[in-house]
Amino acid sequence: MIDAKSEHKIAPWKIEEVNALKELLKSANVIALIDMMEVPAVQLQEIRDKIRDQMTLKMSRNTLIKRAVEEVAEETGNPEFAKLVDYLDKGAAIVVTEMNPFKLFKTLEESKSPAPIKGGAIAPCDIEVKSGSTGMPPGPFLSELKAVGIPAAIDKGKIGIKEDKVVAKEGDVISPKLAVVLSALGIKPVTVGLNVLGVYEEGVIYTSDVLRIDEEEFLGKLQKAYTNAFNLSVNAVIPTSATIETIVQKAFNDAKAVSVESAFITEKTADAILGKAHAQMIAVAKLAGDEALDDDLKEQISSSAVVATEEAPKAETKKEEKKEEAAPAAGLGLLF
């Protein structure tokens, strides 16, 4: 905290700035420190417009941000919050929001945009210039292209590039001349935006390597974990709000199966037990000779044979219908 003795040595605007930063730091649950040193003014304004309704961005000097963070940590009795200053680096700024750290990180990543590379910068990837017309009339630019090793000539009244050319490999230092040429060609090999240094939420500080996740892979793992937990709950008979219905249904089906197999008649299983006994009786009767059967059994065997004969064509018809339905569907599948 800025005491009275030191107050006269500090510029009033700095005291006001620290107080404003402290109020901002106390205003939200999620606090992020970001690096915006390499962001050109045009791109920065575009980013501000994109994130305006989702978070608050405040730029300040690193020394003032450090002081504000430390004072808030002291005033709130939260030493973990003070550790956020360990992530101050380069041209830092503060972002406060109610978004969770992962959503915040994703939003900031999506707000990034391509930009020209500057002379002296390191190539983030192989930079290739494609063949074709530049759309520019003959002039000094032709010499500039050749000076950086790009094969160029006049073609149909315009400067054209003869062939594809890799002008820089990943990790190369870009010369000022090459940077000018790439910018003139509209080649933007770098992505600029707000880079997360650290995000604080409820005593935990997240860094970008933790926040950068593959969403599809993460959701797949989450679904698998849920399925495994669900199956464990059902099989171990540990009821939860999500599994109680399945557990009860499984218990009912198991009890019903035991009742039918053991011929233990209940209100729910009487029909199944009698049906099973009748089917077994018919099966045994079919094995016996006609002389061992009375007229009633012969009639039942005959009836069961007729029913089986009638059901067989129906089953075949259903199979054919399914095949016919599947054929157009398969054909449509080839269109996508």
From Swiss-Prot:
Q: Where is the composition biased (Basic and acidic residues)?
A: 311-326
Q: Which InterPro entries match?
A: Ribosomal_protein_uL10, Ribosomal_uL10, Ribosomal_uL10-like_insert, Ribosomal_uL10-like_insert_sf, Ribosomal_uL10-like_sf, Ribosomal_uL10_arc
Q: Which domain of life is it from?
A: Archaea
Q: Which GO terms describe its molecular function?
A: large ribosomal subunit rRNA binding; structural constituent of ribosome
SUPFAM superfamilies registered for this protein in UniProt: Ribosomal protein L10-like (SSF160369)
Q: Name one GO cellular component term.
A: cytosolic large ribosomal subunit
Key word rRNA-binding present:
yes
A Pfam family recorded for this sequence: Ribosomal_L10
Q: Where is this region: Disordered?
A: 305-336
Note whether Ribosomal protein occurs among the keywords. Answer: yes
Q: Which keywords appear in this protein's UniProt record, sorted alphabetically?
A: Ribonucleoprotein, Ribosomal protein, RNA-binding, rRNA-binding
Parts forming coiled coils: none
Cysteine pairings via disulfide bonds: none
Q: Which CDD domains match?
A: Ribosomal_P0_L10e (cd05795)
One Gene Ontology biological process? cytoplasmic translation
Q: What does this protein do?
A: Forms part of the ribosomal stalk, playing a central role in the interaction of the ribosome with GTP-bound translation factors.
Under the subunit heading, UniProt states: Part of the 50S ribosomal subunit. Forms part of the ribosomal stalk which helps the ribosome interact with GTP-bound translation factors. Forms a heptameric L10(L12)2(L12)2(L12)2 complex, where L10 forms an elongated spine to which the L12 dimers bind in a sequential fashion.
Q: What's this protein's family per the entry?
A: Belongs to the universal ribosomal protein uL10 family.
Q: What's the name of the protein?
A: Large ribosomal subunit protein uL10
Q: What is the lineage of its organism?
A: Archaea, Methanobacteriati, Methanobacteriota, Methanomada group, Methanococci
